[in-house]
Design a protein with these regions (language model features):
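Ser/Thr-centric signal marking residues that sit
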Residues: 4, 26, 42, 76, ...
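Alpha-to-beta junction loops
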Residues: 16-17, 50, 133, 205-208
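Conserved N-terminal beta1-alpha1 strand-loop-helix module at the mouth
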Residues: 1-35, 48, 114
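C-terminal active-site rim and adjoining tail of enzyme catalytic domains
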Residues: 67-74, 139-224
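A residue-level signal for conserved active-site and pocket-lining positions in enzyme catalytic cores
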Residues: 11, 22, 80, 92, ...
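Metal-dependent phosphodiesterase/phospholipase catalytic core, i.e.
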Residues: 28-30, 35-144, 160-163, 167-170, ...
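Short acidic catalytic loops
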Residues: 17-26, 95, 201, 209, ...
């Protein structure tokens, strides 16, 4: 049950250092945890709200009615952070919504210095940086404009204050990781769920690897 409190609680029980999750903004302005553009795949939304209703068109009252399985509900950003902090660093992936709203909510919760906010939309990150320079930012890639994190890309990221380069694992090389470190950024990869990928991440000198199987990854790393 991805992006639910039971999933976050299970990861917290493993004492993981970082928890990555997805957030979108509702029509009412609330920020909730969901990956897709609608709730159909991860809940009974097709039955409750009608198939294909966009997240951005929903209200929080509507979302509260959804069942993600075994009674789990769609959590708000605030509810997710309550589970993760202080044990893990929340790695919040912006999937949709306004920079102003994210900054407002993180400041209201008093966690601006305890989370990392990442996005594939670097214009969103630039807006966040202008509003809240204290927020740690992660740049996800590749994207349609930037295929690889070369010197030019890393200079751009440093220019608006990004602290994390988070790249797709099969598009990331040792040189990219070295360039990121030389520019003062951490180098993360997504998403590796097999030992071969974890071994490669270690060889590349990555600072973190996102996985859907943290228990197996912990077992592997303890014997690496």
């Amino acid at each position: 049950m991805e992006n639910t409190l039971p999933a976050f609680e299970a990861a917290a029980a493993l004492d993981v250092a970082v928890q990555e999750f997805d957030v979108r903004q509702l029509r009412c302005g609330a920020l909730v945890c969901v990956h897709d553009e609608d709730f159909d795949r991860t809940s009974d939304a097709a039955e409750v709200l009608g198939a294909g209703k966009p997240v951005r068109a929903c209200t929080l009252d509507e979302v509260r009615r959804l069942d993600c399985g075994d009674g789990a509900r769609v959590p708000t950003l605030e509810e997710a952070l309550t589970v993760m902090l202080p044990g893990s660093v929340p790695l919040i992936e912006h999937k949709g919504g306004d920079a102003d709203r994210y900054v407002e909510e993180l400041q209201r919760l008093g966690v601006s210095d305890r989370v990392v906010l990442q996005s594939f939309d670097w214009r969103f990150l630039q807006r966040v940086a202008a509003l809240a320079p204290q927020l740690a930012l992660g740049a996800l890639g590749p994207n349609p404009i930037y295929a690889e994190p070369d010197e030019e890309v890393l200079a751009l990221l440093r220019g608006f204050g990004a602290e994390v380069l988070h790249w797709r694992a099969d598009a990331l090389t040792r040189r990219h990781a070295e360039l990121a470190h030389a520019a003062g950024l951490l180098a993360f990869s997504y998403t590796t769920d097999e030992p071969e990928g974890w071994r490669r991440g270690i060889e590349l000198g990555l600072d973190a690897m996102c996985t859907n199987d943290p228990a197996a990854m912990q077992d592997y790393m303890s014997g690496a």
